[in-house]
Amino acid sequence: MKNPNRKADVRRAADGIANRADTLVVVASHGGSAIQYAKWISDILETDMVPANRKYLGYTSLYKNIIYVGCVKEGRIDTLGLLQQNYANFNLDGKHIITVAVGLGDPTDAYLSKLMEYNALTSFGESFYFLPGRSSVEKRKAGEMVKLDRCMKDLPKLYGKEDAEVIGLRLAKGYDGVDREKIQPIIDEIQAVRSNRYQPEISESEGSASDGSDDL
């Protein structure tokens, strides 16, 4: 007896393969919350995922939609500059690029504006999102403390007084703002793109994120 659901199963499988082939999640993380967010996004959207390094960044040329997830290090989204520098080489023109920053600050207008400025996001990509991250005091190695002290001294140079104080406190005391629900706007955007329903908004930024290592 033929299975009446067989054709539907085959069609759904084919759709899944097509979706995986149209979107790539690129993640710059060393095992922290940025990679956790990237995995959630990739699983829900059924996409491929690669690390943000010279060996794999070129794969972005093969996909229609790129979701770049990176932890914030002293105002910079980790390794994003390498992708931006190779914009032409990777044929990124015309692709739907979403940049996701994972850091420790609150998503104030001032803080997000600084991140956009430091990472040249006003002229790169379609959308920018900010997700809340994590700072694990227990996981720090002795050698990291010197670097941490220097970073905390530099915070007032990077951000406004209130934003610098929030980040400094979370670095010193530890913080875990990771929230799976925060990725929903990113999921919604890619699903809208896939169904030709996407309409760009004037401003898109949400959340806040960080790596298992400390994000700034």
Question: How would you name each of these model-derived features?
Answer:
Residues 26, 50-52, 100:
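The conserved SAM/SAH-binding core of class I Rossmann-like methyltransferase domains
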Residues 59-62, 138-140:
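Short, solvent-exposed polar/charged micro-motifs at secondary-structure junctions
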Residues 22, 64-67, 96:
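Structural motif
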Residues 69-72:
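Glycine-rich, N-terminal phosphate-binding loop of Rossmann-like dinucleotide-binding domains
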Residues 45-59:
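A short, well-structured beta->alpha microelement
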Residues 3-20, 44, 48, 74-216:
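FMN-binding flavodoxin-like domain, especially the glycine-rich phosphate-binding loop
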Residues 34, 56-59, 76-77, 108:
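Short, well-ordered alpha-helical microsegments
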Residues 20-44:
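N-terminal beta1-alpha1 ligand-phosphate binding loop
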